[in-house]
């Protein structure tokens, strides 16, 4: 790949105005898009060809230059460069803003980065940016200090003048009043007139006094404000600010809008701020310290990177290329356009209006209003709806801004970068193909011809059936006869990939060799249905074609269905015979007493077959047959003198002989009935002991025999096969009496309602079980339904019980059990009431399934995200740690029995230490692979526990090592370097998610509800554990060893723990209805659970440490899956738990570069501490942090991965501010940028190998002139020269940098 060597990491940062102008090819000055008459882009508009490039290849706007020979010329008439039209996908423009605006991500994001940097509350910041308040940007302290005495004197003087003026005005009015009164006195006026004159004078004086006092107050206010004025002060009172500016404008500067912010940022001293914050953190407490920590993170981000904080204020806005925001003409002559064009037009219109207003010298208030509108227009372009009401288009639909283009399922990351459409693919309905081999699929001819079209056309030309590609294409389109012969030749040994959605685990995509079939449906091998979870009721599957030789080789070696027999979640076979095949093999291997030919002896199997064909020997009769090359089974008793390799006369049936013929020749003789369990054991054993080729062949034999004998068995179902047990009425009558007795006790008031319900439920459960037993006894061995269920082919006894026995108890819509059972069976038919109460459960089941699917899919997505960078990076990390796991436990009689969870805990691991028996004899060396055989040997030798390597204790810096992971469950061998074990773990846990129940069970209806003990189970419990949430009804654990006392008051109970070490008592308040696990005065150990309920994993981590927390999480997750009968290997859960515990919160930073309170990757924390210690300084201290999977995914070192997961804008904002560099170590990052993923064959150690094909191999590829003769590519299969045989990579020394 060309991009392979181009770059090793990807950095994101803040773009400054000069960056934006450098990227740009010209300024967009007009809001016009395209001319409605000519349909050509307008000059200087949003689609301008001069800026963004020509809209037709090699043609300028005015048409002066056409054709490729003018390449690179810039037309002197229209100024358009003659080049390809696709430059319109990459050339950017820009808009020069008449006033700066702030970037909404940095001001409105949570937390507000701008607010933290400038130490302003977000609402104050908003006031400044949107022109509601002035902000002081600089104060000349020295000049103010020097001039203060003079200014004070001036102020006092002015104040005195105001007072004097007031007093003199009042005195004047008093004089006038006196004269007036004297005049009135002389005229002998009435008292009323005098009063009127006095009142009028009083009013005038009051007005003067009020006005003067207001002026004096304002003067004082302005003066006090000026004296205490400092930078970043806000002033929302416009009048006060104007007066302040008019009087003392020399000493300070202030402004509003983004200009104020910009001025502040220009003068901001990062280093000094950082110092003062560190000082606050050292000496401060509480809120101040917390805020200082948060601010320091932001300040540090700018200090330690090349980022300038001025990038948060924009002087120019970039305009993205026009092809990424297209405008297309619809049929009716109207245009459909991208929302971005509307948002850009609003910005340009407002910008142009602002320029005009500034040129006209409009009043400040009008200009400010226009600036505010420009700010809002840019905000809605970047992130519409983040502040205020979103800008809407027709039909009140919010317009999609640049941020909306990135985030969510339909955003750029998830829609186009992580999920791409691919060519060379098709889809069709699937049907069963019982004649296929395990590695084959049937591909419809027409589909195959379309998929392989280019290959067929080239081959037609090579074989001279067509003169050129054009005529070859015509031949293919007209389905000429030669085409089909060529297609047959082309598809030989060219694998195709089949995929069924939903692809829940890696077995959802597998490779097959195509066989051409008639019709239009894809034929699928019946044994791979289990892996795809497919059935033939109308399912569809997609076909993909691997093109390159590398892709074909990978498909054939790694993905071929015959190589994917084991399930990655538990290492057990997934391609098991099912349904018809089981019933056929069951029919073949059962023995029937008293049938034709019983007791005869045959000299060979063929003689017995002849007798069967002649009708004198029944398939299931017990006979003796002489067998050559007989390999005895475990329980075969050899006659005296018999030696291995000799023929033997075996007592068996012809069916058993035919069944054993399907197994490998050296496989021990199986003399058991082949039901589902027995077949599973056989296939499991084959997968452990035989090469994959043999296993695949055997599976095909079993499938063929199964179908053949299923047809011959004549298994049918009729209504007469359903036999209702005769004892049913008697059983029910007996229990009716018991139920009536309980009811009467309740009516007499002897028992409470809860007890009555519980007892009735117990009674009817017992009745149901008795009827079920009677029904099973009444079914004969030859009954078809009995055979179907007993063999494991289909159905279970519970379903049969409901059809032929009794429907039993059902739940009401609340999920509580109704204490009256449905007594009818489906065979007898339900009454109306019974039918009605049965419908609740059925509907709930359907609604549940739909919810479960969505929740389970989201869980898988989070699991994949948190674990996607766990890749096996090295062979051995060299750790001495491991987990000690049990193999055997003593039962009630003191005898050793195999531990029930061995299959999913010890199996497929690597031993950490050697294992010896009681006498000291070494049974297995350290580093040995623990398989079924070794487990059996250790158990036989009486070993009870072993220490094994685990991902939890692995010390690899990145990813994990092969020894700690152990055996890859999908292949049965030690895991390869490069295996993406994190994704496998996520799939293994997520895939069975849909089988888990959704509900919070009420274990016995209302009874448990009264105790308030809802046990969260199923999927919600799994989510609670992986998200590390505190569970509902959390149970406390003892924080120290000591004695516990129970104290009760009327309101509540509390447990008081007195620690042994004499530290102060610890009190745990608990609910009165909680069930205690300790009694008053008991001794408890540290970490012991005190009450029934779920434990908070964070508490376990705090009290018992990380190892115990890991163990607790693994056990709890496994408990939920086991309760549903789902087997998942512990190592998958361990991989996820390792990711949850890989961060450390820094408590004290010491002399390191880490910040207190920072969440640091454990590897980075340890590396930094090693560096500090080696320089003789003080290392940082930290505590382990348990993070939920969502939080852990967002906290990853890779910003690309985090942004494509959730909260895209928040992640990108933070990453750009910190100037983060993505080392591209995980899988998602590389998928996003289109590089090969660094896992599997994408690792350098596998990609940098060249193997030259031999001439003989080239010649062998096609006998006729080769279709691929110009490829340096070796054919797969055929008789290849020995030097071209596959070579194990371990034989190559690939150099140390690949390790």
From Swiss-Prot:
Catalytic reactions of this protein: RNA(n) + a ribonucleoside 5'-triphosphate = RNA(n+1) + diphosphate
Gene3D superfamilies, per database record: 1.10.132.30, 1.10.150.390, 1.10.1790.20, 1.10.40.90, 2.40.40.20, 2.40.50.100, RNA polymerase II, clamp domain (4.10.860.120), RNA polymerase Rpb1, domain 3 (1.10.274.100)
Binding residues for Zn(2+) 2: 877, 954, 961, 964
E.C. code: 2.7.7.6
Binding site for Mg(2+): 535, 537, 539
Sequence similarity: Belongs to the RNA polymerase beta' chain family.
The protein, known as: DNA-directed RNA polymerase subunit beta'
Organism: Renibacterium salmoninarum (strain ATCC 33209 / DSM 20767 / JCM 11484 / NBRC 15589 / NCIMB 2235)
